[in-house]
UniProtKB/Swiss-Prot annotation:
InterPro entries according to UniProt: G_CP_dom, NA-bd_OB-fold, P-loop_NTPase, Ribosome_biogen_GTPase_RsgA, RsgA_GTPase_dom
A single BP term in Gene Ontology: ribosomal small subunit biogenesis
Annotated region described as Disordered, given as residue ranges: 1-35
GO terms under cellular component: cytoplasm
Family to which the UniProt record says this protein belongs: Belongs to the TRAFAC class YlqF/YawG GTPase family. RsgA subfamily.
UniProt EC number: 3.6.1.-
Protein task: One of several proteins that assist in the late maturation steps of the functional core of the 30S ribosomal subunit. Helps release RbfA from mature subunits. May play a role in the assembly of ribosomal proteins into the subunit. Circularly permuted GTPase that catalyzes slow GTP hydrolysis, GTPase activity is stimulated by the 30S ribosomal subunit.
Superkingdom, natural source: Bacteria
Name used for this protein in its record: Small ribosomal subunit biogenesis GTPase RsgA
Residues given in the record as GTP binding sites: 159-162, 213-221
């Protein structure tokens, strides 16, 4: 038996302690008298073994995290205890005691660390794209698959439309119509001219959203345009002149409040959103327009490529499924196959 493996009795004690800490009405223990009463809070941001927790009165507190807490991310609802003033005049950090059950969690697979959670308790993923650094339908489709798998509503936002001339606008409208036709909500906005921003604010109201998308598409600029001027501005970098790719500006996921009542989590940008932790069947189901045709192929094990009698390919040829989406579906499956052997190889070496 591994010396790090907990016995059943130890596991029961850990679980019992966790449940006890979820009771906010309990009395502080004598051996931690420098901490106040337990109360509810929400994680605003996580920094290593510390987290910023917002109390019910809106005040944020830097807290340590109990070692028994296996996972803590921005958006988590927690039970925490504030630090009291020590005799030496040094402020004692608070401590996160327990985490409430999540309604949802957005995860990102990592080739070396496995599946990594990004944010919790979100009910809307704002997929931000732009004509610069690149209008990538592949990245949009990856996030849409994640939304469908998590059962979280997506909102596609195309930023920087002020950079488009009439022909460019017509081209972009055609690309976005691919998503409108299959039921997705799409907004075209500009954080510079504020075109479309009022509709964007309405879509954010009453929601806990997360901004997702490749670097350089203007996620931070959009947030700065939406946040009240009293809030600190989020760092904004331009697209790199050398690579043409966006430079990462957000270093840790952080939750912000809007005056209209919505909450937004700004997360580090990603250039590619991996989905290799999902089964191929989940990817297929993640394309909503495919669902009416699944089960109608000639062969039960149809790969939806060049197999005779493929219902999906016939739908593409008939214009019922966008060819761009069908191609991205196969690109996602191919990228999964390329990533999995690397992950397996890394695990074998350990």
């Amino acid at each position: 038996m591994s010396k790090n493996k907990l016995s059943k009795g130890q596991q029961r004690r850990v679980q019992a302690n966790h449940q006890r800490r979820l009771r906010t009405d309990r009395k502080p223990e004598l051996d931690d008298s420098q901490l106040g009463d337990a109360q509810e809070g929400i994680v605003i941001s996580r920094f290593g073994q510390h987290a910023d927790v917002e109390a019910a009165d809106g005040v944020q507190h830097r807290c340590n995290i109990r070692r028994t807490i296996k996972s803590l991310v921005t958006g988590d609802r927690v039970v925490w205890r504030p630090g009291l003033q020590a005799q030496e005049g040094v402020r004692v950090k608070g401590i996160v005691e327990a985490v409430h059950e999540r309604t949802s969690v957005l995860t990102r697979p990592d080739l070396y660390d496995g599946v990594k959670p990004i944010a919790a308790n979100i009910d809307q993923i704002v997929i931000v794209s732009a004509i610069l650094p690149e209008l990538s339908l592949n990245i949009i489709d990856r996030y849409l698959v994640a939304c469908e798998t998590l059962d979280v509503e997506p909102l596609i936002v195309l930023n920087k439309i002020d950079l488009l001339d009439a022909d460019g606008r017509k081209f972009v409208d055609g690309m976005m119509d691919i998503y409108r036709r299959i039921g997705y909500n799409v907004l075209e906005v500009s954080s510079q001219t504020r075109e479309g921003m009022e509709a964007f604010e309405q879509a954010l109201a009453g929601r806990i959203s997360i901004f997702a998308g490749q670097s350089g598409v203007g996620k931070s600029s959009l947030l700065n345009a939406l946040l009240p001027p009293t809030d600190n501005e989020i760092l904004v970098n331009t697209v790199s002149d050398n690579s043409g790719l966006g430079q990462h500006t957000t270093t840790a996921a952080r939750l912000y409040h809007f005056q209209h009542g919505g909450d937004v989590i700004d997360s580090p940008g990603v250039r590619e959103f991996g989905l290799w932790h999902l089964a191929p069947e989940q990817i297929t189901q993640g394309f909503v327009e495919f669902r009416d045709y699944l089960g109608h192929c000639k062969f039960r094990d149809c790969s939806h490529t060049n197999d005779p009698g493929c219902a999906l390919r016939e739908a593409v040829e008939q214009g019922k499924i966008a060819e761009e989406r069908f191609d991205n579906y196969h690109r996602i499956l191919e990228s999964m196959e390329q990533a999995k052997p690397r992950k397996t190889s890394d695990s074998d070496e350990k």
